Amino acid sequence: MTNQKISRDVHHLAHRMSGFQESSRIVPEEAPIAMSYNGTTQAVMMATPGDLEDFAIGFSLTENIVTRIEEIEALDIVAFESGIDIQMKLAKQPEQRLSARRRFMAGPVGCGLCGIDSIEQALRPLHPLEECSTTFTTRDIAAAVASLGAAQALNAKTHATHGAGFFRPGEGLFAVREDIGRHNALDKLIGAVAREGLLAEEGIVAITSRVSVEMVQKAVMLGVPVLAAISAPTALAIRTAEAANLTLVALVRDEEFDIYTHCGRIIES
């Protein structure tokens, strides 16, 4: 394991109404993070080098490299001058999963499907979420998104990171994870939820970004019934959420928002 700085204070020249002046601000760190399984690198992403164990577990689950956290027998984080290698040992190397999700190229920030070899893999079929009687109030949706923004410590300093949070009614946010990449932030959150053994069907995942199809895929892989976002969804994200029995809520502004799929899970406060 290794401790990595996730932000840095940098000096710069700023132009204000009074003219040029020396200034400083805190900016997030960014580093190449390699995901390696049984000695083979599967993917390299540019990411904020924090919560790396959560990141590795969440990525492994959402990419279907493992189906249970127990399939990761060992996890080591090794820092090099050029980046970080997260080295995982699988109890039984699932060759078919690794081959099916093979990525040989680096994924830039904000790219959740970069490096996937085919359209079929990018739009892989999802098992629809099981029907459940759980409902959430309009106040729950508003609270999930509002509390996420307030809990983003790194973004408060840098104004440069996305956030993802897991919210349970009556309890509030369980966890918040941040990253320069929205997909990475959600993977980190999924890893945190999995490590704690929480019941995903009892909560809401809130995100600070738009809703693309990859974000829907990851939420469904976690098993959460509701995905709530500050920004708008894509048409493909809506179709995917509908087919997967996921309630997709977007453009959340307090208790005003749009519900695009499976509206019955949301009731008036």
Swiss-Prot record:
The family line of this record is: Belongs to the FdhD family.
Q: Report the source organism.
A: Brucella abortus biovar 1 (strain 9-941)
Question: Which GO BP terms, alphabetically?
Answer: Mo-molybdopterin cofactor biosynthetic process
**Molecular functions (GO terms):** sulfur carrier activity; sulfurtransferase activity
Described purpose of this protein according to its UniProt entry: Required for formate dehydrogenase (FDH) activity. Acts as a sulfur carrier protein that transfers sulfur from IscS to the molybdenum cofactor prior to its insertion into FDH.
Where does it mainly reside?
A: cytoplasm
The gene behind this protein is fdhD
Instruction: Output the PANTHER family linked to this UniProt entry.
Output: FORMATE DEHYDROGENASE (PTHR30592), SULFUR CARRIER PROTEIN FDHD (PTHR30592:SF1)
The UniProt keyword set, sorted, is: Cytoplasm, Molybdenum cofactor biosynthesis
- Protein location: Cytoplasm
Sorted alphabetically, the Gene Ontology cellular component annotations on this record are: cytoplasm
- Full protein name: Sulfur carrier protein FdhD
Q: Pfam families in the record, alphabetically?
A: FdhD-NarQ
> Which InterPro entries has this protein been placed in?
Cytidine_deaminase-like, FdhD
Enzyme active site: 111 (cysteine persulfide intermediate)
Q: Which Gene3D superfamilies match?
A: 3.10.20.10, Cytidine Deaminase, domain 2 (3.40.140.10)
Which superkingdom? Bacteria
